[in-house]
C-alpha cells in the first residue's frame, strides 16, 4: 500500500514537471505579438537605461510573466543596465500576454512615462491613435505651477494649449560627455577629490500623489523629473537610491538613514534631490505636512554626518518657495548689464590639540528651482523647467565645467524661458532659479574618468 502511494506521488511529480515544461514550450511557440516585439526593440536603449527593476520584477513574478529562476538570473547580473537588458531579452519569449502585463507593471510601479512611450510607439506601428494615459492629464502640456491654490489651477483651460510652446513627449535619451584625461590632469589638484567608483551615493525623493487636508494637486510631469535625474546621476557615476510618495515623517527618517549609510565613508561625494510641492523653507510630504529644509541640511552637516566631512554634498530642490507667479518685466532698450553677485567665504578654522576644527556646515551646494516667495513652473509632459535645464547643462558640460558654473548656466536657461498658456495667468510667466554654496574648492564631476 505504501509502495503504491509512493509510486502515485512520484507519478504526480513527473506529471507536474511535464506540465511546467509543456507550458514553457507553449510560451516559446506562442510568443509575443510581432508588433509588441517591435515596440520593445524600438525602445530598447531607453528601457535599458531607465527601467527601475526592484519592484517591477515582483509585479512580473506575481503576473506569472517571469519565474523565480528568471528573477534570480536577472538579479545576478552586475549593474542595473545589464539587469534591464536581461529582462528585455526574456520578455519577448514570455507569451502573448507579456507585453500588456509589462505595461501594467510599469504603471503600477510609477514608471508610467515608459508605458506611455511604449504605447505611443505601438500606436505608430499599428497606425492607430494612441490611447490616453491615466498617469497624468495629457490635455495640459503647458506649464503649471508646482503648488498653486485650486482656484488658480481651475483657470487652466484645455482650449488654450493646442499651440503650446512647451509640448514634449518626455525625457530624451541622455548621454553625458566624458571628461578627457588632459582636462582631469589640468584641474584635479585644485578641485575636490572625485575619483571613487562610484562617485558617491545619490538619493532622489519624488512626491507625486498627495493626500491630506492641504488639497495639494497631483504633480503631473513629476515622473519625468525623477526618471531623468536617476538616469543623469547614474551616467555621472553615482549609485542612485529612489523613493516615491513619502510622508513628511518618512522623508525625515529616510534622509537620516541615507545620511548614515556606511558607503559614504569610501565615496567622494553625495547628491540629494527633493521633488515635491513646497513653501519657503519647507517641502511637503504626501500627507500635506512640511519637512523643513534646514532639517535636511542638518542631517548632512559635519556634526551629524562625519562620513561626508570635507566632501562635497549637492542638493537640488524642485519645489515652490511661495505662491507668487513671476510676471516678469519689460526689458529696457540697451545692453543688459545684469550680473550675478559673487559670494565670499572666510576660513574660520582654529587648531585645537593639533587637530583642525570644522564649521558645523560646509562643503554644500544647493540649487533651487525658483527664488524665495515664488512658484516653480512644471511642464506636464517634459517635467519641470529647472530639472530639464539642470539635466541639459550637466549632461553637456560636466566634462569641462565645475558645478557652480554649471548652475549659473542653468540660471541663464531658466531666465530665457517663458510660459505659453494664452488666456491664463501663466501666459508669459517667468521663473528664476538660484543656488547657494559653502563649497571650499571647485567641484568637478570628471564623468567617465578614469575609464572603467
Curated annotation (Swiss-Prot):
Residues 32-121 form the CARD domain. The keyword Cell cycle does not apply. The mature protease can process its own propeptide, but not that of other caspases. Residues 327-336 have a biased composition (Basic and acidic residues). SMART domains: CARD (SM00114), CASc (SM00115). Disulfide bonds: none annotated. InterPro entries: CARD, CASP2_CARD, Caspase-like_dom_sf, Caspase_cys_AS, Caspase_his_AS, DEATH-like_dom_sf, Pept_C14, Pept_C14_caspase. Its EC number is 3.4.22.55. The keyword Hydrolase applies. PROSITE patterns: CARD, CASPASE_CYS, CASPASE_HIS, CASPASE_P10, CASPASE_P20. The modification Phosphoserine is found at residues 157, 340. It catalyses: Strict requirement for an Asp residue at P1, with 316-Asp being essential for proteolytic activity and has a preferred cleavage sequence of Val-Asp-Val-Ala-Asp-|-. It comes from the Eukaryota. One of its GO terms (cellular component) is cytoplasm. Residues 327-349 are annotated as: Disordered. Residues 2-169, 326-333 form a propeptide. The CARD domain mediates a direct interaction with CRADD. Heterotetramer that consists of two anti-parallel arranged heterodimers, each one formed by a p18 subunit and a p12 subunit. Forms a complex named the PIDDosome with PIDD1 and CRADD. Interacts with NOL3 (via CARD domain); inhibits CASP2 activity in a phosphorylation-dependent manner. Belongs to the peptidase C14A family. Involved in the activation cascade of caspases responsible for apoptosis execution. Might function by either activating some proteins required for cell death or inactivating proteins necessary for cell survival. Associates with PIDD1 and CRADD to form the PIDDosome, a complex that activates CASP2 and triggers apoptosis in response to genotoxic stress. This is Caspase-2.
Amino acid at each position: 500500500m505504501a509502495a503504491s502511494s509512493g509510486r502515485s506521488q512520484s507519478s504526480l511529480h513527473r506529471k507536474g514537471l511535464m506540465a511546467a515544461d509543456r507550458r514553457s514550450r507553449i510560451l516559446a511557440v506562442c510568443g509575443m505579438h510581432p508588433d509588441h516585439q517591435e515596440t520593445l526593440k524600438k525602445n530598447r536603449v531607453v528601457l535599458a537605461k531607465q527601467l527601475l527593476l526592484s519592484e517591477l520584477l515582483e509585479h512580473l513574478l506575481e503576473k506569472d510573466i517571469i519565474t523565480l529562476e528568471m528573477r534570480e538570473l536577472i538579479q545576478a547580473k552586475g549593474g542595473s543596465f545589464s539587469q534591464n537588458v536581461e529582462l528585455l531579452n526574456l520578455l519577448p519569449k514570455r507569451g502573448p500576454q507579456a507585453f500588456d502585463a509589462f505595461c501594467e507593471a510599469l504603471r503600477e510601479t510609477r514608471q508610467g512615462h515608459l508605458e506611455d512611450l511604449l504605447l505611443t510607439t505601438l500606436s505608430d506601428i499599428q497606425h492607430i491613435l494612441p490611447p490616453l494615459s491615466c498617469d497624468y492629464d495629457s490635455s495640459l502640456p503647458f506649464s503649471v505651477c508646482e503648488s498653486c491654490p485650486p482656484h488658480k489651477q481651475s483657470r487652466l483651460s484645455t482650449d488654450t494649449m493646442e499651440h503650446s510652446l512647451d509640448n514634449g513627449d518626455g525625457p530624451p535619451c541622455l548621454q553625458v560627455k566624458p571628461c578627457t584625461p588632459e582636462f582631469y590632469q589640468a584641474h584635479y589638484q585644485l578641485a575636490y577629490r572625485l575619483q571613487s567608483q562610484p562617485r558617491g551615493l545619490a538619493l532622489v525623493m519624488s512626491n507625486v500623489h498627495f493626500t491630506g487636508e492641504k488639497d495639494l494637486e497631483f504633480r503631473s510631469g513629476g515622473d519625468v523629473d525623477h526618471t531623468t535625474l536617476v538616469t543623469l546621476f547614474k551616467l555621472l557615476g553615482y549609485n542612485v537610491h529612489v523613493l516615491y510618495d513619502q510622508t513628511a515623517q518618512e522623508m525625515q527618517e529616510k534622509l537620516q538613514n541615507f545620511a548614515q549609510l556606511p558607503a559614504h565613508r569610501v565615496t567622494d561625494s553625495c547628491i540629494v534631490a527633493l521633488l515635491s510641492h513646497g513653501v519657503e523653507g519647507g517641502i511637503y510630504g504626501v500627507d500635506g505636512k512640511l519637512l523643513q529644509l534646514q532639517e535636511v541640511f542638518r542631517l548632512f552637516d559635519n556634526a551629524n554626518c562625519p562620513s561626508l566631512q570635507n566632501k562635497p554634498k549637492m542638493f537640488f530642490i524642485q519645489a515652490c518657495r511661495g505662491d507668487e507667479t513671476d510676471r516678469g518685466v519689460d526689458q529696457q532698450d540697451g545692453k543688459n548689464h545684469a550680473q550675478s553677485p559673487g559670494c565670499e567665504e572666510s576660513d574660520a578654522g582654529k587648531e585645537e590639540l593639533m587637530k583642525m576644527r570644522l564649521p558645523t556646515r560646509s562643503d554644500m551646494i544647493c540649487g533651487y528651482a525658483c527664488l524665495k516667495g515664488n512658484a516653480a513652473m512644471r511642464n506636464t509632459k517634459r517635467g519641470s523647467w529647472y530639472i530639464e535645464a539642470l539635466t541639459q547643462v550637466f549632461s553637456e558640460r560636466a566634462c569641462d565645467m565645475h558645478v557652480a558654473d554649471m548652475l549659473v548656466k542653468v540660471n541663464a536657461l531658466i531666465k530665457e524661458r517663458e510660459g505659453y498658456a494664452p488666456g491664463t495667468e501663466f501666459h508669459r510667466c517667468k521663473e528664476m532659479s538660484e543656488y547657494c554654496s559653502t563649497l571650499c574648492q571647485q567641484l568637478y564631476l570628471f564623468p567617465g574618468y578614469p575609464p572603467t
